[in-house]
Amino acid sequence: MRALIPESDSRPADVLVPRYTNGKDTCIDVTVINSCRLDLLLRSSEEPGYALNHVFNSKWSKHGAACERAGMVFLPLAFDTFGAIHPQGVDFIKKLGKSVARSTCQEDSECVSQLFQRLSILLVKGNVSLLLNRRPDIQVP
């Protein structure tokens, strides 16, 4: 969303949740990283979570301080193409699941579990779509 930060054209939020964190607006920047990217591959193979931390820190350095100065909370919601989620993202998803549970009169654990399952299905669908669109053309004799 543009124009969230005065005198800036940056877009720190894919999703803006009003008054979500201690009464402050929360800017959620959803990002998916491929840990097999050539510039990340070696470190990712040696250090679990390296790609997630890399993209989280990159997003934070780009938007975090500006959001704080504007009185907002910034959360880079970082996912790996293989299904890993940055620890702060896991905490956010659990909090979101508990909020849904309260509003629907369900058990917290049930809503949190369903939310993670839905995210997992979306990731698998996205990966399958990428694979199917990259398959080589088959020449029929």
List the model feature ranges, each with a label.
Residues 1-13, 21-26, 32-141:
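Non-catalytic C-terminal interaction segments of nucleic acid-processing enzymes
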